[in-house]
Regions:
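FAD-site-proximal beta/loop scaffold in flavoenzymes
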Residues: 159-176, 259-335
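Gly/Ala-rich phosphate-binding loop of Rossmann-like dinucleotide-binding domains
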Residues: 17, 21, 192-197
Length: 433
């Protein structure tokens, strides 16, 4: 029986474990904090649970246009408020429940789970340290799926009370009076949008000239317009030089010397791979300058028999991609039929209000001449159903080959964009016009 050892219990790890078990391998999975990884315990599941409440609040706030009244109260915002302590209790409860569900699935497939830390000792041995002591596990195949953690700025050390990373916000008992969000990437934009909808005064500090610098420019423009309309302060081309805690809040000093005061500060400036202390050098596993493990399209590292999946590889850091990388690794390691990872049909979503979803070739690639394609944009403002639902902001943009009109990419901005984008993904995969 093939022995498989997996380091990391996130989507890349537990999905690989399920595939390995189904292919009759002897599978052991190790994680320090519990099954589900950051996706379940501190990132995707918690943030999307928080965002679910934010979406409901947005619907309530915009319901007046559709003729909804709450008694005789004219100011709906004064009636509809949130209990952040209850929201965060629900967040933690759902994360724990999902982790338990994953544990149950793995147990049913006879996968051994060890709560502890692990490191490689060569390309065929994993050393595990747990409450039961140290154990050496020999392996025919090893998968490293250790994820990543929030990048910490020396000028903004988190204290878990006023200066926070996105893993610490779920300990808050009360809604911040004024939240300063540093970083306008996906994580920063999502939290800024969510807390704005929950009723918090939000200041979004972006070092670039627009929010979501890595996303479609037209989509980012729509989002920034909506956020400002809803009362958010967006400071573009403003780099945070220092964050200092005061007696009852925080002061953020910008690079131009100006300051912004708030009650709390959320730092969302990217991630760092969890690859230190794993013994990768003992197996000659190559990492890049940022510490991410280099892999090919079937998740192989530079070391024979050692695979990697998920955020620790830096390959399109999405839970769905991590899961597919893990499955591909097991199919390849265990000799099953395998199709290399193809990111051109993988959609990525930003769960702001409105949502932003993209797939395939981008506007930037088209403009740079990387692919010969033309774009077609359909604003939601002119769509009959959008009008019925009171939707004013957003669009559908498709990138198509000249002549046959084959769809090669797309962007959707609007309610449920994360679901609508799947039709575009299928069109790309099927070569539809």
């Amino acid at each position: 029986m093939t022995r498989v050892v997996i380091i990391g219990g996130g989507p890349g790890g537990y999905e690989a474990a399920l595939v390995g078990a189904q292919l009759d391998a002897d599978v052991t999975i190790i994680d320090r904090t519990g099954l589900g990884g950051s996706a379940v315990l501190t990132d995707c599941v918690p943030s999307k649970t928080l965002i679910a409440t934010a979406e409901l609040m947005t619907s309530i706030q915009e319901s007046r246009e559709l003729g909804v009244r709450f008694g005789h109260v004219a100011d709906i915002e004064a009636v509809a408020t949130v209990d952040l302590a209850k929201i965060n209790a629900r967040v933690k409860r759902l994360a724990s429940s999902q982790s338990s569900d994953i544990a149950g699935r793995l147990d049913a497939e006879s996968v051994r789970f060890i709560m502890g830390s692990a490191r490689l000792d060569g390309a065929e041995t994993v050393v595990v340290t747990s409450d039961d002591g140290e154990e050496r596990l020999d392996a025919d195949a090893i998968l490293v799926a250790t994820g990543a953690h929030p990048r910490i700025l020396d000028t903004a050390p988190p204290d878990g009370e006023r200066i926070l990373t996105w893993t610490q916000v779920y300990d808050l008992e009360e809604l911040p009076e004024r939240l300063i969000v540093i970083g306008s990437g996906v994580t920063g934009a999502e939290f800024a949008s969510a807390y704005n909808a929950l009723g918090c005064d939000v200041v979004l500090v972006s070092s670039r000239d627009r929010v979501l610098p890595g996303e479609d420019a037209d989509a980012a423009e729509v989002l920034e317009h909506v956020l400002k309309r809803r009362g958010m302060t967006v400071l573009g081309r403003s780099r945070a030089a220092d964050v200092r805690r005061t007696e009852d809040g925080v002061v953020v000093t910008l690079s131009d010397g100006s300051t912004v005061e708030g009650s709390h500060c959320l730092v969302a400036v990217g991630s760092v791979p969890n690859t230190e202390g794993l013994g990768l050098e003992s197996a000659n596993v190559v990492t890049d300058d940022a510490g991410y493990i280099s892999v090919d399209r079937v998740s192989r590292t530079s070391a024979r028999g050692v695979y990697a999946a998920g955020d620790c590889t830096g390959v399109l850091m999405l839970a769905s991609v991590a899961a597919m990388q893990g499955r591909i690794a097991m199919w390849h390691a265990l000799g099953d039929a395998v199709k290399p990872l193809d990111l051109k049909t993988v959609s990525s979503n930003v769960f702001t209000a409105p949502e932003i979803a993209t797939v395939g070739w981008s506007q930037q690639a088209v403009d740079a001449g990387e692919i010969d394609a033309r774009s077609l944009t359909l604003p939601l403002a002119g769509n009959a159903r959008a009008k019925m639902q009171g939707v004013q902001d957003g669009f559908v943009k498709l990138f198509c080959r000249p002549g046959p009109g084959t769809v090669v990419g797309g962007v959707v901005v609007g309610p449920r964009a994360s679901e609508l984008i799947h039709a575009v993904s299928l069109a790309i995969e099927g070569g539809l016009t």
